[in-house]
Regions:
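A Zn2+-metalloprotease active-site environment signal
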Residues: 1-153
Length: 153
């Protein structure tokens, strides 16, 4: 739908605007702004490089540790670390967007409904601990819970 780049540039796919309301697009852009403001792209690159460096160091150690680090088990471990880090960043960017929308006097409902639309597209898909994004239905519920706590319908 959209993504943030390390240089602070945000890209939005035109298809997003066709399927979402203006309020939902505002929420998605706020989410991507969160990634930029919170330094997620750069931190993500650092984590990816760090996990790869650990894996290379383990491989150079040789023996069982070296063999495991070069196996599919090593691939899974690296992917798990990166995906869990990414899921945490997604949740932080969701909260950033929610707070930004509120500060600007814009309804955060578009954030919840954008996730609900994405959840419909994800129906039947099995989620995994290796996913780099939390499930959209869970993200929508988190926003709905925040709205309820803040007295927003």
């Amino acid at each position: 739908n959209a993504f943030a780049m390390a240089n602070g540039c945000i890209r939005v796919y035109s298809g997003l605007m066709d399927m979402m309301t203006d309020n939902e697009v505002e929420a998605v852009i706020g989410h991507e702004m969160g990634h930029v403001a919170l330094g997620h792209v750069k931190k993500g690159m650092q984590v990816a490089l760090g996990t790869n460096a650990v894996r290379v160091a383990a491989a150079s150690a040789g023996g069982i540790v070296g063999s495991l680090s070069q196996s599919q088990l090593g691939d899974l471990g690296e992917k798990l670390v990166n995906s869990q880090f990414s899921q945490r960043q997604e949740a932080e960017a969701d909260d950033y967007s929610y707070d930004l929308l509120r500060q600007r006097g814009i309804s955060p409902a578009g954030l919840a409904t954008s996730f609900e639309k994405l959840a419909k597209l994800e129906e039947g898909r099995q989620s995994s601990m290796f996913d780099d994004h939390p499930a959209s239905a869970e993200r929508a519920q988190h926003i709905r819970d925040r709205m309820s706590a803040d007295g927003i319908k």
